[in-house]
């Protein structure tokens, strides 16, 4: 028995650098209710923020340039990196003369459905808005974030939420305290391929927040497709099913089980076979980034 944590890369914070949390998320429920005329799918989901995630290191530049420090975990070129795009988006929207150096201390597995890229981008938007003194309100920042990805707005708002539309129409939710046993199967399936899969259910009956609270809205539309396509995901779900109700987050491939307490989650972790990339995180009542920003003076 044992555990393997996701790899963490650390940068030495020197003069001018500051470090900021970029929390992960889970989708506690996800279904597809239809398809819009523009080709995008209508979703219903519940976003749960976690107290665990990446750390974004930022340093303001006076010369207006924006650079990512270090290599991207995914090998994405700098201009296409979401954190760089987020910084440029804010810069052009506000016509600010300042720039930034950005380093991502990565913990959230790439392509796991834990929201790492979206959360990183949201943290850059929120923090540079403060460091650059551009003072855009949250609604404007969320609208900018939506141009980067459908999951970015929930991280900008920083609260657990019921989401509809493509995931951007948010209703804040108060969720009970919980701890989560997370497992990364180590595979990445492009979301576009999953949406094109003929076995994906795209016409689920619309649910309500009340349905979710009552426990009649649950599961993830992508799970049966992922089980069929990816043996690693099927295996991860089977292993987790030995300790609780196993679910997929987002479009996968990450999986999780919810527990009432951290002690229960830690005990379940110890029961897993050795060598799995599994760990425990607590659910957050709101983004830890908001708490950090609230204590800072700019």
Curated annotation (Swiss-Prot):
One biological process term in Gene Ontology: terpenoid biosynthetic process
GO MF, one example: 4-(cytidine 5'-diphospho)-2-C-methyl-D-erythritol kinase activity
Residues bound to ATP are: 109-119
The protein's Enzyme Commission number: 2.7.1.148
Cite the InterPro entries for this sequence. GHMP_kinase_C_dom, GHMP_kinase_C_sf, GHMP_kinase_N_dom, IspE, Ribosomal_Su5_D2-typ_SF, Ribsml_uS5_D2-typ_fold_subgr
Q: Write out the catalytic residues in the record.
A: 25, 151
Coiled-coil regions listed: none
Task: Kindly state which keywords UniProt assigns to this record, in alphabetical order.
Answer: ATP-binding, Isoprene biosynthesis, Kinase, Nucleotide-binding, Transferase
Which protein family is named in the record? Belongs to the GHMP kinase family. IspE subfamily.
Q: Quote the NCBIfam families the UniProt record gives.
A: ispE
Q: What does this protein do?
A: Catalyzes the phosphorylation of the position 2 hydroxy group of 4-diphosphocytidyl-2C-methyl-D-erythritol.
Q: What is this protein called?
A: 4-diphosphocytidyl-2-C-methyl-D-erythritol kinase
Which species expresses this protein natively? Xylella fastidiosa (strain 9a5c)
